[in-house]
Structures are given as structure tokens and as C-alpha cells.
Amino acid sequence: MSITSVASVFKGDFAIGSQITVRGWVRSRRDSKAGISFLAVYDGSCFDPIQGVVPNNLENYTNEVLKLTAGCSVVMTGEVVESPGQGQAFEMQVTKVEVAGLVEDPDTYPMAAKRHSIEHLRELAHLRPRTNIIGAVARVRNCLSQAIHRFYNEQGYIWVSTPLITASDTEGAGEMFRVSTLDLENLPRTDKGTVDYAEDFFGKESFLTVSGQLNAETYACALSKVYTFGPTFRAENSNTSRHLAEFWMVEPEVAFANLDDAAKLAEDMLKYCFKAVLEERRDDLEFFAQRVEKTAIERLENFVTSDFAQIDYTDAIEILKACDKDFEYDVEWGIDLHSEHERYLAEEHFKAPVVVKNYPKDIKAFYMRLNDDGKTVAAMDVLAPGIGEIIGGAQREERLDVLDARLAEMELSQEDYWWYRDLRRYGTVPHAGFGLGFERLVSYVTGVSNIRDVIPFPRSPKSANF
């Protein structure tokens, strides 16, 4: 006898007549007049629960089985049989039910209701994985994570663990969480009256990272092809469906590569991930197509068969100006494209994923390679129908004199980036990479529009519960 997952039963890994044991939680119990009960038990391995047909001759039928309610945990043993009902091929003829844990008060159990709003579930983040939607999101998120690691491993990339604590601001935006052990009631001061961070734990101002990119570049300039995949932090006071204070980023960096190479890598990676989720999590995608976004599957299938359109930022501005769309934000050369502009390009103009390249330097970071026109940098955004920007990347500035000039323009200290400048002094090399906001990817795949619902415990302004 073996303990097995519900998913493996539905895959047909066990022949009819096999004795199995399933461990999980009760989704529902239904009693028949014939003296049997039907337990729907799920273990999180797949979307559907398995049905256990429980006879009333079990020892604990009256005093335990008939007390089972949604959320109770059980160990259910029995025989695999063909299911006469529609919806699943197999069920269990149960010979033993062990109750691991009861729900104290079924009437007040928060997950007992048939359906909660997804907004309400955020207040119950410790229990929401028990719902169909958040369980499905978790499995899709896992599938995408595994696909990303597989993709880069198969391509010969090395995974680099970049630090979460840093003294560098990758974006130059200043919206960073400070890390300090100083006594806030008794801050040490310099002669000028400013906080003396020399007395702090790291001996200088330190922050939670906004990106692993700069650190990844150091390894790319020695190991050729690397990537990071980990949490990043932004102290933006933004309460929108697209922003989190803590989120995960995928950031590849490639030596001897240019912007076109980065664009091709982004396309290959996205298509690989979407193919994986279409193959491996079809049951969850069917749920999302039924309950959340009816085009969820169709959208992914179209994506993996589409050629990415490519366009310069300047040409994109002209397209936006020429269209008869009434945008909320005015369109002119030099603006950072807003979501409405991005979605028009991807959904209405090109009707396909699109890579917008060569943005004005004044709206991009210091490390992006300055183009020959002196006005634009070799930056790109990948725009996807249905969401807009999903990836941002660039060829990095490998020329020390140009990098120093850009640092000066943005009033950033060469001293703070001395190690980053060293890469340009000792065997500099053209290199490129990009960043993918992982939660936006999960949101795109599932159709769940608020990224607070695609990360287990969302962190946002005034919200750090659990």
C-alpha cells in the first residue's frame, strides 16, 4: 500500500483495484439515503479533488465521518475504481478514514462559504491557499518558476544568488527601503547634524535591493551567461493592481551580447514558459478560462505561435499620435509609455507581442548604452497583449568614459559604483540583459488582474500582515 497524490491517481498511475492512501483536506461531504457518504478530498497536487465513497459500516462512520466538514484533514485509504459520474475517471471505494484534524467551529470557519471575493481573501492570506483560485495560482506559479530554471539551465546559464542588502541604487530612483540597526530614539549624528551611518551595522547607508542586475553583471563578465531569480523591493507609495513593495525578478545577463540578443532571449524564454504551463497545468488554466479570463488559454496559445513585432520608440510615438484613440495621457516624444499606450500597440495596432527599442536616455537608467544619436539608449520593453509591459531590458554601457558621464548627468557618485566601473576598466565587454517581474508573468498567465493575488503574502503600503 502506498501514500500517493491525487494528481497521480487522475493521471492513471494506479490500476483499477489498486489499494492507495490519500492524505488531504475535505472540500465537501455529501450523504446519501443509501447509507453512504461522498467525501471530496484535495491535497493541492491538482485542481480537482478525488471522491471517496465511504460506507456506513466503518467503525468511525457515525462518530467521525458524519462530523467531517470543509477544511477537516483526513487520511483516506481504499481501492481505485472507475467513477460512474461525469468529470473524473477515477474515485475511491474507501475502507478506512482517519481524521487528522477537525474544524473547531464549522459555522465560523472562514473558508466554509461557497465563494469569497478575491479582495476579501487578501485579508485571509493564511487560509486562502485552500480556495480553488489561490491553489490554482500557486500551482501555476510553481510551474512557471520551474520552467524558468529549466530554460536557463538548458541554455547553459549559471544561476547567481545576488544580495538582498545593497548600498547601490540600480534604478537611480531613490525609492528604496533602508536597512539599519541604529536606535531610532537615539540616532548618532555627524558634525553636520546628519545621521552618522558609519555607526550603523554595515558602516554605511544600506538598503534592500531593487534589482540584482548590477551584481549579476559582474558574474556575466566572468562566466558569460548568468541569471538571478529572487525577491526585490521598491518603496513606492503606490496602491495599484500592478505594484508591490516586495516582488520577484528574473534577470539574465549575457556577455558579448547586444540589444537584439536580449530581445531574442526574452522571446524564447516567454514562449518556453507558456508552452510549459499549457502542457503541465491544463486543469488550472481551464479553471481560469472558466472563472477569471475566458481567453486565458487562447491568449497563451496565440503568444507561443506569434512572431514578436519590433519597433523603435520614436516610431511607436508616431503610431500613437496618428491613431484616433483618446488616451488619458498625452503622447509626445520623451514620455515614458503608459499602460494604455503599451496595450494599444500590442492589442490593437500589432495584435501581437511587441518589442519597443531605443528609448530617450532621460527616462532610462544610467547603465543603459548610449546610442550614436546621443539622445536615446539601447533599451527595450516587451509589451504583451492584455497586460502591456512584461519585460524591460537593455544593452549595458561598457565604455567607462560614457558611463562616467551618465553617472554625472544623474548626479550619482562614481565612488558608490567603483566596483561597477571596474568592470569597464578590466577587460570590458559588450553585454546585455533584462528584468522580468515574475508576478506580472503569473498575472498574465492566469488572468488574475491584481498582482497581490498571485504572490502568497503581498507586501504593499500600510500592509505587511502575516
Swiss-Prot record:
Q: What is its EC number?
A: 6.1.1.22
BP term (GO), one: asparaginyl-tRNA aminoacylation
Q: Which UniProt keywords apply?
A: Aminoacyl-tRNA synthetase, ATP-binding, Cytoplasm, Ligase, Nucleotide-binding, Protein biosynthesis
* Pfam families referenced in this protein's UniProt entry, alphabetically: tRNA-synt_2, tRNA_anti-codon
Under the heading InterPro entries, the entry gives:
Aa-tRNA-synt_II, aa-tRNA-synth_II, aa-tRNA-synth_II/BPL/LPL, Asn-tRNA-ligase, Asp/Asn-tRNA-synth_IIb, NA-bd_OB-fold, NA-bd_OB_tRNA
Molecular function (GO) terms listed? asparagine-tRNA ligase activity; ATP binding; nucleic acid binding
**What reaction is this protein's catalytic activity?**
tRNA(Asn) + L-asparagine + ATP = L-asparaginyl-tRNA(Asn) + AMP + diphosphate + H(+)
Give the chief site where it resides. cytoplasm
Q: What class of enzyme is it?
A: ligase
Where is this gene product found? Cytoplasm
**Gene Ontology terms: cellular component:** cytoplasm
Q: Would the keyword Plastid turn up in this protein's UniProt record?
A: no
Superkingdom of this protein's organism: Bacteria
Q: How does it assemble?
A: Homodimer.
Family under the similarity heading: Belongs to the class-II aminoacyl-tRNA synthetase family.
Give the protein name, as stated in the record: Asparagine--tRNA ligase
Q: Which gene encodes it?
A: asnS
